[in-house]
Amino acid sequence: MQNKNSMLFRSGKNLLVYGLMFIMLSIAVDWYRKPSEPNAFAQQVFYDLQQQPKVIAQLSHQKPMLLYFWGSWCNYCKFTSPAVQQLMDDKVAVLSVALKSGDPQQVADYLNQENYHFPVINDPDGEISKSWDIQATPTILIIKDGKVVQHTTGLTSYWGLKVRLWLSSLT
């Protein structure tokens, strides 16, 4: 009986160690891939696919907003985009950038096909993403009062984003 408990304790300890190593590795990768904010980005006017002006400073003034860099060709984005859409449905301010996903009509067709309704700035040549030093998709920035307060790259969940938004609202 004691041998069984000892083995169970050892397994739990190993699981904890591997879990902590995974978290530390994820943090290190996020730090390495940290985007660079372009000068005066918060005041810059962007136009979405419907030609509606979007200003990050205004969108992030009342509460944190999500800036989501994605691509229609990105496999991880296929798992992250539904979470972003769900946050949009929850009334979170979302602005997204479609990186090298085609002309505006191709991006609009993709959004309709996937039933996504978040506002999209098309970045067909990657110039906007390059100005932010985006190295991977998906990349998600949480911006509050015109300042990037959190970021993450790669696969993430609705609840992971929800917690990050909540933590950002506390500062």
Q: Residue locations for each model-derived region?
A:
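Structural microenvironment flanking redox-active thiols in thiol-disulfide oxidoreductases
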Residues: 78-114, 124-130
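Short active-site neighborhood of thiol/selenol oxidoreductases, capturing the structured segment around
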Residues: 55-78, 84
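Short acidic-hydrophobic, aromatic-tinged amphipathic segments that line or gate anion-handling sites
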Residues: 47, 119-123
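Thiol/disulfide oxidoreductase modules built on the thioredoxin-like
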Residues: 112-116, 124-169
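Hydrophobic beta-strand anchors of alpha/beta hydrolase catalytic cores
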Residues: 66-67, 94, 140
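N-terminal targeting signals for export/organelle localization
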Residues: 1-47, 171
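Loop/turn elements at helix/coil->beta-strand transitions in domains of secreted/extracellular proteins
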Residues: 62-64, 90-93, 118
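Short, small/polar residue-rich loop motifs at catalytic or cofactor-binding pockets
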Residues: 40, 63, 135-137
